[in-house]
Regions:
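Glycine-rich active-site loop/strand segments that organize a redox cofactor
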Residues: 40-90, 162, 204-262
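Glycine-rich dinucleotide-binding loop and its adjacent helix/turn
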Residues: 74, 80-87, 135-195, 201, ...
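Extended alpha-helical coiled-coil/bundle linker/stalk regions that scaffold oligomerization
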Residues: 293, 298, 303-358
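C-terminal active-site-capping segments
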Residues: 386-442
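Feature captures the FAD/FMN-dependent oxidoreductase FAD-binding
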Residues: 70, 74-144, 266, 273-300
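Short hydrophobic core segments
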Residues: 11-13, 126-142, 176-178, 307-318
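N-terminal low-complexity, Ser/Thr- and acidic-residue-enriched intrinsically disordered segments
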Residues: 2-55, 412-413, 421-422, 426-429, ...
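Rossmann-like dinucleotide/flavin-binding elements
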Residues: 19-28, 164-212, 346-399
Length: 442
């Protein structure tokens, strides 16, 4: 066993998008801090290094990535995988150029400030951490290409992750897409756009979800969307009524108006994409799969046969799980979490802003985590916490908020920005009181 000892101000576990956003913001506000990044992969970018080839951002590139480097062409642009991977290469170069950041790719964090190369686990390095350990893995993203199914699959079943679909879509007669989250939607859209007829696609949907309409999450429109959602929470006392009102006024959509969704995961699609998805009528709603064999797809109460020449596409990873929140700041530790609904990278950058502000951890923890939602009744408390956090962050970091490209309001003209800030202040208390009508699950 080899022991080495190094000293660093911040030891960051994980090199994904949230860690990158945190480090980028920290570098802008602390020109002397030293940072070590510990990452199992060889590159920054986290799950983007394992993403399926045809993936695109689900929300505008204008407010994704890190504060210091623009991504995409602005506006409604949705960057594709090659551009995103090149972007994180640029981020890496920025970190290297600073002279403040050391990247330990291909390393495992062992706990107790110790790391070791995955290829040489006996070669241990121990860090003296002067300020904080930063946990960039708390959100525990499940990556579709490497996440095994939660059910038994017989060895003779043609079963593959979504990543392989690009080489297999023209070799099979029938397709079974397993999973109805955003990954499952992307799989169905890929097949349809590559000439596979809708009747050849069988979509196993354990549940239906409400989705965000991407048209309402564009630069200049998001705050209006937040206010519409706030109004719906104030006016209704049941979660399904909130979403039905939002569906009527615009901003929330679902694949089948005859089915009441039981899930809400922040999946973002356009009305045009939703119209394409509606072309797939072979929707199997039998709950979760228990077992997949040549005898059929086994559910709790029924087994369904399938054709011999059928390919099964695994889209069952819970990419954005509803994690139990924990205080962001604790003694000598930071757990990176969202502080705005469905906006992880902004949250990480804002946490760096708080870390470098002149206040106590008790004050910093006035900013509460906003966990990813799972069911519709999670939404009122999520939106309430988002509004409260926005107001508190403006008190802590007013100029930083206005200048942060990751904060969606920063793209608005100053008079619109200020007007929306006033509206948020006026409505926040009413939303907070109204949210108490809804049960909380997270």
């Amino acid at each position: 066993m080899t022991d080495k000892f190094l000293e660093v101000d911040y030891l960051v576990i994980g090199g994904g998008a949230m860690s990158a956003a945190f480090i980028d913001a920290l570098l802008d506000r602390d020109r002397s801090a030293t940072i070590a990044i510990i990452e199992r992969r060889d590159r920054l970018g986290g799950h983007w290094n394992n993403a399926y080839p045809f993936v695109r951002l689900h929300q505008p590139a204008a407010f994704y990535g890190v504060n210091s480097i623009q991504l995409g062409k602005g506006g409604a642009d949705l960057s594709a995988l090659p551009e995103i991977q090149e972007y994180y290469h640029k981020v890496t170069k920025r970190f290297e150029k600073s002279g403040q950041v050391s990247f330990y790719g291909g390393h495992e964090y062992l706990g107790d400030n110790k790391i070791a190369p995955i290829a040489d686990p006996e070669n241990i390095t121990t860090f003296k951490v002067n300020k904080r350990l930063v946990n960039g893995t708390y959100m525990a993203v499940e990556i579709p290409s490497v996440h095994p199914p939660k059910f038994e699959v017989a060895d003779d079943i043609p079963f593959m992750p979504l990543n392989d679909l690009i080489t297999q879509y023209d070799k099979w007669e029938q397709f079974y897409v397993l999973g109805c989250g955003k990954t499952g939607m992307d799989a169905v859209l890929f097949l349809l756009r590559n000439g596979v007829a809708g009747e050849k696609i069988h979509w196993v949907m354990p549940n239906d979800s409400w989705c965000l309409d991407r048209d309402y999450l564009q630069v200049g429109r998001i705050m209006g969307t937040v206010l519409e959602h706030s109004d719906a929470i104030i006016k209704n006392d049941k979660a399904h009524k909130v979403f039905e009102q939002l569906e009527r006024v615009g901003g929330i959509i679902r694949i089948d108006k005859a089915v009441a969704p039981t899930k809400w995961k922040c999946a973002t699609v356009s009305p045009e994409e939703m119209a394409e998805l509606e072309a797939v009528q072979n929707r199997i709603r039998k709950g979760r799969i228990k077992r997949l064999t040549r005898d059929g797809i086994e559910f709790a109460d029924e087994t369904i046969a399938f054709p011999q020449a059928a390919l099964f596409v695994n889209c069952t990873a819970d990419a954005l799980a509803a994690k139990t929140p924990t205080p962001i700041f604790s003694e000598r530790r930071i757990d990176l979490q969202s502080v705005f609904f469905c906006q992880q990278v902004f949250g990480a950058a804002a946490i760096a802003g708080l870390e470098t502000s002149k206040c106590t951890d008790k004050m910093r923890n006035w900013i509460k985590p906003v966990p990813h939602p799972d069911i519709p009744s999670d939404w009122p408390s999520m939106l309430t916490t988002t509004l409260d956090n926005a107001l508190k962050l403006h008190a802590f970091l007013p100029l930083w908020m206005m200048r942060s490209r990751l904060f969606y309001m920063s793209h608005d003209p100053i008079h619109v920005y200020l007007a929306n800030a006033v509206k948020a202040f006026v409505i926040a208390g009413r939303v907070r009181r109204a949210a108490k009508k809804f049960p909380r699950t997270i």
